[in-house]
Amino acid sequence: MKHGFIKVAAATPRVTVADCKANGEEILKAIHEMEKEHVKLMVFPEFCITGYTCHDLFLQRCLLDSAWDELLHIADETKETDALIFVGLPLRHRGKLYNVAAALNHGRIVGFVPKTHIPNYNEFYEQRQFAGAEEEDVEFVDFLKGVINEEDEFWDEIPFGTELIFECEEFPEFTVAAELCEDLWVPAPPSIRHAINGAHIIVNISASDEMVGKDSYRRTLVSGQSARLICGYIYASAGEGESTQDLVFGGQNMIAENGSMLAESRRFENGIIYSEIDVQRLADERRRMSTYPAVSICSHTRVGFSVAEEETRLTRKYPQYPFVPSVKEERDERCEEILNIQAMGLKKRMEHIHSRSAVVGLSGGLDSTLALLVMARAFDRMGMPRDQIHCVTMPCFGTTDRTYQNACKLSRCLGAKLTEVNIKEAVNVHFRDIGHDPDIHDVTYENSQARERTQILMDTANKEGGVLVGTGDLSELALGWATYNGDHMSMYGVNASVPKTLVRHLVRYYADTCGDEELKEVLLDILDTPVSPELLPPKDGKIAQKTEDLVGPYELHDFYLYYMLRAGFTPDKIYRLACLTFDGIYDKETILKWLKTFYRRFFAQQFKRSCLPDGPKVGSVALSPRGDLRMPSDASARIWQDVLEKIEI
């Protein structure tokens, strides 16, 4: 359970209707399979001990006695099983019959959760046999009186009620509550109360029959509820073996976490699905959301259970590019939306200040290319001619012919006005003014060029009555890879919350959809150009200064950035996930090296982010000091760095 990962599973064993012993054998067989995978939370379907389709046989004492006996047998056989287990059966209580989820832990029955909402419509007639639970105080009942020896170490009254939260004694954030089938389909499911009272995982033991299209509706319910409640949701449904007299059960099992489907079974095939739910992330996300209610300490009864602490082997996958959807259709839709957000942000700013034009420094690189594409879209939306977009290319010591030519071609293809200002002479004059040797290629040599360009762009914007559009992206801002008061500064930064890995896809999307072959060719060549600030002289006419050789691969830094800010993960957890995700691409030494660089630069460069220009937020991670990141410029990175130093490779 290191880093908060809980190994969980949903199982659909084959049932024999009304044969509790046979069903118990199948349940135990599945439990033993899950034990091999070190599962800590095992969930079975509704009425898995009897079968859901017993109908009026549920009124037979013989079946009820057999179900109870089999529950005790399963409990006895799982004394050594290190897990919390949920199974379903009919249970007699206070003269009524209830449909319950029984929770088992190390041979003990630790709780009974009755179904609240009993369906009696369409194909369902459960009210014929079962009573619905009342939302009332939990009872502690001597269900085992006369069944076991009172001196037995497992003797205890068993809590019965809907308001139960099962809390792990070794890991308090591992909290579980249960609801049953129909409970999820009603306007106010019990899981709402469970979640806001501290349950990080909801289990649903279900027997949901199949109809055309019902599977997608169930999937939406489960993923949506996990997102709404910021919880893990495990759904185990009845499958093959149930009576097909009138219905068919497909065994659709699902494991979801905060809106993401971690695992789903193939329908019409019994079996087990596995995944790992990150309860630390769920707890952190709830704490971050100020509108999520504080946990009440009195409305639910806490029931303790125990599992051994161990490091969970991870099988769930994390995307290498968390900012970029992996499915092309979703990616294209996301790109279109982002371009519109950027364009609308710029449009509003220009209209507000009555701007007649816009200015951008065009280098032939990715970021300035994206900024120009956004400007073209904004001008189209405003009905303004694109020749009022003033592109300025400013070659200097490090400019290569490839980037220069691409800048010229790009502005021409988009119908923007292009001005060339060679800044070599101005920078050399500046070197003489400050007494700097131009043969010393240090930070002064580089930053003087960046600040000269910004001065030209600012003054050009004033001259043209326009706004200077910034080009810096989210990844550069996170690393502080920008010259303070140089390319760091603008009048409106359209790329400020777009990470570098996403910039590439936005430009690629524009190339694929623009309908202009010449423009597409230019954009594809820009995509193929190494990322560089071009502040050092080229070698043999080619780019000598490659950003990713200096600060590290952007795909790693974007991964680090996402899981640090969006998820709040610790450095060692990010390292673990990066090693898993980039296995075979980067070795552990490389991952750790650049992770240390990331934290060092992220903290040291906050002073640049503290005075960022305005710019539109486009995703869940942003660095604006006025919005998403309120961070002091002089905070110490020591405790994060200490964690990294303790990592053993």
Task: Please place each PLM-identified region on the residue numbering.
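Enzyme catalytic cores with a strong preference for nitrogen-chemistry domains
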Residues: 1-359, 377-386, 418
